[in-house]
Amino acid sequence: MTVEELKKKKIAVLMGGLSAEREVSLNSGKAVLASLVRQGFQAVGIDVGRDLPQRLAEEKAEVAFIALHGRFGEDGSVQGLLELMGIPYTGSGVLASALAIDKIASKVIFASAGLTLAPYQVLRRGEEFKLANPLPVVVKPSREGSSVGVGIVRDPSRMQAALDEAFRYDSEILIEGFIDGREVQVGILDGKALGAIEIVPKGEFYDYEAKYTDGGAQHILPARLPEAVYGEVLRQGEKAHAALGCDCYSRVDFLVTETGDCFLLEVNTLPGMTDLSLLPEIAGGAGITFGELVLRILQAASLKI
């Protein structure tokens, strides 16, 4: 849609929600809403709950800018509702969203696309556990973001505690072989890589606190990689985005080893849009302001089914 068309429409910024990433989503939504209002759009914020259909109808929303993170927002649930209501929305559609948030399902797609993954095993609640990979390993819920419930296990005595923590958030969890490498994240806009940023967390890894605490991690843009490796991680980011059928934008996370191997971790279909978020920072490095980023995402709003 053109800017002129969009300025005639009522835009609902969906934020908050019911997931463990609620507070982050509120920050993303407030930043997006403020940007839209500054740019002259008729925008209103909606804190998403189970009354969302009623709220959308009350506000007479004609377009939805989704600034939700985690379950019931990033997993295809809200996208399906918007499809049913006929309200164009930003970001990826139902299927791509559902695949991306499910680390187990997405790994099957990534492997079939020839992308490099860390060795992993799946454990479901109630199953007998037998470790398939040598320590250290990374334990994580299958369907959470922002490193919620994630832990690194180096000592066998800490394994059960890590499993219990991950199972607090999901009935299925992943146990991945630990990859010693740089944390590199690729920003995608309109299906093309904008650049790659390197994350150097102050703690053991890039956990929730490091992501959302000012000074919790150092961001290096562009990532400190040899030219050939930098180009390869951008290509793999685009490939992962396309493999899931993502629409418009995403952030793709990698671990890059000293030998230049790029291990894909996940694709985030609704990356953070806060002051500390990586996609806006990567976009800024490509000469795209926050307002321009918001506008380009909004212009791509559509029904996908």
Swiss-Prot record:
Superkingdom of origin: Bacteria
Instruction: Tell me one Pfam family matched here.
Output: Dala_Dala_lig_N
Q: Which residues are involved in binding Mg(2+) 2?
A: E266, N268
Q: Main localization of the protein?
A: cytoplasm
According to UniProt, this protein's pathway is: Cell wall biogenesis; peptidoglycan biosynthesis
Which chemical reaction does it catalyze? 2 D-alanine + ATP = D-alanyl-D-alanine + ADP + phosphate + H(+)
- A Gene Ontology BP annotation from the UniProt entry: cell wall organization
What cofactors are annotated for this protein?
Mg(2+); Mn(2+)
Cite the cofactor comment: Binds 2 magnesium or manganese ions per subunit.
Query: Which class of enzymes does this protein belong to?
Result: ligase
HAMAP family in the record: Dala_Dala_lig (MF_00047)
What is this protein called in UniProt? D-alanine--D-alanine ligase
Q: Name the species this protein comes from.
A: Geobacter sp. (strain M21)
Taxonomic lineage is: Bacteria, Pseudomonadati, Thermodesulfobacteriota, Desulfuromonadia, Geobacterales
